[in-house]
């Protein structure tokens, strides 16, 4: 303690001759003369106790309970920071500690029930809205109304696609014939070859997250990326061109793949599926002929306004949504090949998105992780199934950012991904997107 009472102003320590008190507290005033006024700690001007000055300064620092508490708080913060660092180094590409069966077991049985009447009610609702919008726009025929019509009708075309998509998965009903009839009517009306797309989409689900075997929006390898001519490379990663890719995909598939959704001999299909592909191509051609005939009834300009522009809006919705469910630069989604790929790990590379008011309109397709793992679940059960599965998925589930009524925030996600997510390595089994610096600077 001697060092603690040394003065910073050269004051001497307590005299060694001072008696050591035997009592902790002085209760009798008469005992106060225990200390003589000539002792070195008192001023020589001492006259009684009315005027005296202690020549020992206060210690520079006295450990206190408050200081100890502060030290404990700092230690807790250090430990907490270590925990945060552990969270930050979570490896989304590592094999998950759960199995597909664990997720399935967590989902309530009612989520697997398909109600054809409920499914059909959505078809009736959407078709009625489509016809009502077209009738209203044709009647008003006002240039202030047309842009609103295009946005609304294009979104409804996209909603029809999602219902046809459910038919293709068999989540619409347990009746294969009903699924096929409704699927053809819905998809043909928006110029999609139902069976051709259904089969290729099945391939997409069976190989999701696989660099080479995935069917749609799969990453380009570095070799393929660098083999593209400048125009193709720029168009693929520059808006709005990627958002208009779907019709070209139906005809020619993605870069690095060959075949067509309209060609029954394409390597997309096995021989047993060729009749189905022909049927869908005939339905698609019939719809195209009907649209061509309507040109002579209402005129080509009116057809462009009533159908052509909404069709393009629908295509943009389709490309926008499907791209963002499998891309997100900030989310660092892994891709696999070889022995590292599995159905479960591939499905966990998908990501949910919140579309605000559009969620209900396009039948909750934004709840995409559970849909990809279990495409048999009807769309009207996906939200409940997702909530039930979250405790099992843990960190492998990426909570979507909450959207405003219109999902404008997703435009930023799209732009960042197109600017940074260009290709993956030609080698390795767990891969992440890499950036072409030259292409990134051009954007």
Swiss-Prot record:
CC terms in the record's Gene Ontology section: chloroplast membrane
Catalytic activity: a (7Z,10Z)-hexadecadienoyl-containing glycerolipid + 2 reduced [2Fe-2S]-[ferredoxin] + O2 + 2 H(+) = a (7Z,10Z,13Z)-hexadecatrienoyl-containing glycerolipid + 2 oxidized [2Fe-2S]-[ferredoxin] + 2 H2O; a (9Z,12Z)-octadecadienoyl-containing glycerolipid + 2 reduced [2Fe-2S]-[ferredoxin] + O2 + 2 H(+) = (9Z,12Z,15Z)-octadecatrienoyl-containing glycerolipid + 2 oxidized [2Fe-2S]-[ferredoxin] + 2 H2O
First and last residues of the transit peptide: 1-51
Keywords: Chloroplast, Membrane, Oxidoreductase, Plastid, Transit peptide, Transmembrane, Transmembrane helix
Short sequence motif Histidine box-3: positions: 368-372
Motif window: Histidine box-1: 165-169
Residues annotated as transmembrane: 120-140, 143-163, 281-301, 304-324
Pfam families found in the cross-reference section: DUF3474 (PF11960), FA_desaturase (PF00487)
Stretches of the chain forming a coiled coil according to its record: none
Entry superkingdom: Eukaryota
Pathway field: Lipid metabolism; polyunsaturated fatty acid biosynthesis
Enzyme class name: oxidoreductase
EC number, UniProt record: 1.14.19.35
Membrane topology listed for this record: Multi-pass membrane protein
Subcellular location field: Plastid, Chloroplast membrane
Family: Belongs to the fatty acid desaturase type 1 family.
Role summary: Chloroplast omega-3 fatty acid desaturase introduces the third double bond in the biosynthesis of 18:3, and probably also 16:3 fatty acids, important constituents of plant membranes. It is thought to use ferredoxin as an electron donor and to act on fatty acids esterified to galactolipids, sulfolipids and phosphatidylglycerol.
Protein name: sn-2 acyl-lipid omega-3 desaturase (ferredoxin), chloroplastic
Organism: Helianthus annuus (Common sunflower)
Lineage: Eukaryota, Viridiplantae, Streptophyta, Embryophyta, Tracheophyta
């Amino acid at each position: 303690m001697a060092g603690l009472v040394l003065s910073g102003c050269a004051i001497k320590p307590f005299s060694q001759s001072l008696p050591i008190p035997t009592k902790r507290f002085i209760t009798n005033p008469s005992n106060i003369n225990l200390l003589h006024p000539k002792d070195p700690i008192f001023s020589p001007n001492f006259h009684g106790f009315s005027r005296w000055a202690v020549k020992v300064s206060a210690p520079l620092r006295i450990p206190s309970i408050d200081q100890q508490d502060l030290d404990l708080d700092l230690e807790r913060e250090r430990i907490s920071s270590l925990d945060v660092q552990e969270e930050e180094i979570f490896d989304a590409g590592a094999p998950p500690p759960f199995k597909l069966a664990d997720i399935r077991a967590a989902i309530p049985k009612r989520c697997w029930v398909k109600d054809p009447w409920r499914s059909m009610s959505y078809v009736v609702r959407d078709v009625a809205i489509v016809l009502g919008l077209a009738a209203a726009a044709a009647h008003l025929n006002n240039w202030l109304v047309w842009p609103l019509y295009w946005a609304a009708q294009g979104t409804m075309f996209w909603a029809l696609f999602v219902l046809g998509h459910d038919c293709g998965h068999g989540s619409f009903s347990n009746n294969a014939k009903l699924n096929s009839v409704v699927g053809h009517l819905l998809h043909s009306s928006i110029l999609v070859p139902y069976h051709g797309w259904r089969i290729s989409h099945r391939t997409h689900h069976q190989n999701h997250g696989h660099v080479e075997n995935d069917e749609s929006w799969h990453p380009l390898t570095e070799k393929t990326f660098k083999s593209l001519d400048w125009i193709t490379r720029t168009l693929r990663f520059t808006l709005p061109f990627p958002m208009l890719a779907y019709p070209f995909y139906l005809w020619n598939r993605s870069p690095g793949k060959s075949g067509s959704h309209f060609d029954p001999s394409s390597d997309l299909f096995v021989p047993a599926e060729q009749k189905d592909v022909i049927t869908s191509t005939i339905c698609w051609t019939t719809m195209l002929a009907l649209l061509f005939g309507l040109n002579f009834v209402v005129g080509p300009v009116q057809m462009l306004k009533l159908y052509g522009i909404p069709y393009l809006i629908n295509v943009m919705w389709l490309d926008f949504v499907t791209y963002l469910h499998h891309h997100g630069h900030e989310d660092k989604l892994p891709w696999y090949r070889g022995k590292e790929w599995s159905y479960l790990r591939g499905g966990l590379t998908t990501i949910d998105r919140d579309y605000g008011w559009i969620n209900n309109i396009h039948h909750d397709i934004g709840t995409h992780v559970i849909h990809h793992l279990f495409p048999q679940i009807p769309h009207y059960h996906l939200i409940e199934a997702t909530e039930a599965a979250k405790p099992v998925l843990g960190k492998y589930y990426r909570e979507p950012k909450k959207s405003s009524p219109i999902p404008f925030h997703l435009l930023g996600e799209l732009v960042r991904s197109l600017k940074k997510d260009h290709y993956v390595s030609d080698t390795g089994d767990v891969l992440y997107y890499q950036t072409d610096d030259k292409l990134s600077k051009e954007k």
